[in-house]
Amino acid sequence: MKVLVINCGSSSLKYQVIDMENNSVLAKGNFKRIGEKESFLEHKINGKMYVINEYAPNHEVALKCIFDELLNKEHPALNSLQDINAVGHRIVHGGEYFNSSVLVTEDVIKKITDCGKFAPLHNYAAVQGIKACIELLPNVPQVTVFDTAFHQTMPKESFIYPIPYEYYE
């Protein structure tokens, strides 16, 4: 099983392709400066770093470039995109909606967007990445993993006590 894990920031997209059978990283990288003319991809495979200067106006274009590199005939990490069995998305803020990882649905996307006010530099970019993956890998399960999920498992008094109650309301 091969899993693509992505972390979309406001102007970057970090990723790893992990082979779960032998717990190895097949490729990893970081697409930097998304939305700027000087955007570029740092792609590492087999210990060698490749730098690809490519204009990516948005996360979808960046993801397409990453997929091109994963399939690069000179140094392929994958034989085809069908080799990807699942995609994991790191999400900074899930609000009170999520206390564990969940499969992506339209409702999940809406709730991540709703929580964008708490993490505007990350959640909105993450939604772009999710939508791009759904479009480019339509039959692959997409899973979201929330940084805030741990806090949903705390006793209510533990997360309310340190702040004035009206902030919680």
Describe each PLM feature range.
Residues 1-4:
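Extreme N-terminal starter segment of soluble prokaryotic enzymes
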Residues 6-11:
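A short acidic Gly-Thr/Ser loop motif
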Residues 12-56:
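Short glycine-rich, Thr/Ser-proximal phosphate-binding strand/loop in the N-terminal lobe
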Residues 21, 26, 81, 137-139:
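Short, well-ordered coil/turn elements that cap or connect secondary structure elements
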Residues 37-85, 115, 129:
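Conserved active-site "lid/cap" helical segment
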Residues 57-61, 65, 103, 107, ...:
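Conserved active-site and cofactor/substrate-binding residues in soluble primary-metabolism enzymes
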Residues 70, 76-122, 143, 150-160:
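Short beta-strand-loop/turn "lid" adjacent to the catalytic site in phosphate-handling enzymes
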Residues 123-124, 130-169:
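Phosphate-binding/catalytic loop of phosphoryl-transfer enzymes
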